[in-house]
Design a protein with these regions (language model features):
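Gly/Gly-Pro- and Ser/Thr-rich, intrinsically disordered tail segments characteristic of DNA damage-repair
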Residues: 1-228, 238, 282, 365-422
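Short, charged/polar surface micro-motifs in flexible loops or helix N-caps
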Residues: 15, 38-41, 301-305, 350-354
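C-terminal hydrophobic structural anchor segments
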Residues: 321, 327-384
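A generic structural signal for short beta-strands and their flanking turns/coil linkers
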Residues: 28-30, 71, 140, 290-294, ...
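DNA-contacting surface of Y-family translesion DNA polymerases
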Residues: 9, 192-340
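Short Gly/Ser/Thr- and Asp/Glu-enriched loop/turn motifs at secondary-structure junctions
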Residues: 104-108, 147-150, 289-293, 338-342
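Short, hydrophobic beta-strand segments
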Residues: 109-115, 307-310, 352, 357-363
Length: 422
């Protein structure tokens, strides 16, 4: 009989605000809101501290509205480099207990501690040690869920906040989980929750007791998946941290990013796609490839994801052509049922840059060579003076979204459970 898994989900509490308070102790206990640009009243709240939340301030709220809820609120500009550094520190702590660490954005991660129990004790004990270590070494708090799968572990970390540990086991599973709103379950976004409400399915327990055939008929394959999750059935593994295919031939080059805030507009999406395309193009040049296809992957705030590919008329290593192809795919296939949370751009169908290209009548070989030389020169400047020494003008329209060095950070985030159209 296989040993039951022990999965932890660690969620840093009010992460951006907590990092700011750890870095600026004078902010402790005060109502603060981290935002992209405090000088722009049209900006939004990225994260609020618990004192601000108790006054009604919420993530995504316009700054003027946040100030109406809390007159004494302190607006703090976002420092993405700081949050990235704190995120890497938390991962170093996780890796002391297991090599199966699957980050989800900067502030969350799943850990498979099944094999760690012989060294460190029960899952609950490991969770307590991790929580105490993060608090002692970093000065921030986290909530940890402990269960036998990823879905229930995440429900556990959401169950009590801040600075709490929740164990969901076979004995208390129905007591804890079944009364929770269906919207608390992984993959239940606003649109799906509204549909479930229409079928009088308001809780996870009601979802678990529904007929799977009915859910599949009404919601498609996601309905069957939600029924499994509601019944505690989730066999998805926790990936090993930075798992790589060693010495495998390069078949594609890509980057993805879970953004520091939800993406709300086409311009938000274009900024992120372009900075990812810059990274992909630079790495194509480093490895002496051109690509004949581009893939874009999108994940929304309900954690539903899909990928789409397109074939290019000419092989390229140019960032603008890669970005334009990816953005065209996004415009064609995404319909804004939910806000976007993560985007990936990948160059596929690679060929060595030494292979000759068949140039069409409307495609200038001289222009292509000129652009490739220009982008290679920009690579050289960035290698010498840093990534932020040269940036596109559009990046200055949103300092938070543009504060990602995708090439050097090279963060590839996990795909969701589902593949399909949103």
């Amino acid at each position: 009989m296989a040993k039951e898994r022990v999965i932890l989900h660690c969620d840093m509490n009010c992460f951006y605000a907590s990092c700011e308070m750890a870095y600026h102790p004078e902010l402790h206990g005060k109502p603060i809101a981290v935002c992209g640009d405090p000088e722009r009243r049209s900006g939004i709240v990225l994260t609020a501290s618990y004192p601000a939340k108790r006054m009604g301030v919420k993530t995504g709220m316009p700054l003027w509205e946040a100030q109406q809820h809390c007159r004494d609120i302190i607006f703090v500009p976002a420092h993405y480099d700081l949050y990235t550094r704190f995120s890497s520190y938390t991962r170093e702590i996780f890796l002391r207990y297991t090599d199966q660490v699957e980050p989800f954005g900067l502030d969350e991660a799943w850990l498979d501690c099944t094999a760690s129990q012989s060294l460190f004790g029960t899952g609950e004990r490991i969770a307590r040690e991790i929580s105490d270590t993060i608090k002692d070494e970093l000065g921030i708090t986290c909530s940890v869920g402990v269960s036998w799968n990823k879905t229930l572990a995440k429900l556990g970390s959401d169950y009590k906040k801040p600075d709490a540990i929740t164990v969901i086991n076979r004995q208390n599973f129905e007591k804890i989980v079944f009364p929770l709103p269906a919207s608390d379950l992984l993959y239940v976004g606003k649109k799906t929750a509204s549909k479930l409400d229409g079928y009088a399915i308001h809780t996870i327990g009601a979802l678990a007791k529904s007929r799977p055939e009915f859910l599949q008929q009404k919601l498609g394959k996601v309905g069957l998946l939600l029924w499994r999750f509601a019944n505690g059935l989730d066999n998805a593994p926790v990936a090993k941290y930075e798992q790589r295919e060693v010495l495998a031939p390069i078949k594609s080059i890509g980057n993805s990013w879970t953004t520091p805030r939800d993406l709300l507009t086409d311009q938000d999406v274009w900024i992120v796609i372009y900075l990812l395309a810059e990274s992909v193009a630079a790495r194509l040049r480093e490895n002496h490839f051109r690509c004949r296809g581009v893939e874009v992957s999108l994940r929304d705030s309900s954690l539903f994801s899909f990928e789409r590919q397109t074939h290019l008329s000419q092989p390229t290593m140019q960032e603008k052509e890669i970005a334009t192809a990816a953005f065209t795919l996004y415009k064609k296939h995404y319909h804004w049922n939910e806000h976007l949370r993560s985007i990936g751009v990948r160059a596929v169908d690679l060929q060595p840059d030494t292979e000759p290209c068949q140039i069409s009548f409307d495609y200038s070989a001289e222009k292509q060579e000129e652009m490739e030389h220009l982008e290679a020169a920009i690579d050289g400047v960035r290698n010498r003076f840093g990534y932020y020494s040269v940036q596109r003008a559009i990046m200055y329209t949103d300092k938070l979204l543009s504060r990602c060095d995708a090439k050097n950070d090279h963060t590839i985030h996990p795909h969701g459970y589902l593949q399909g159209s949103i």
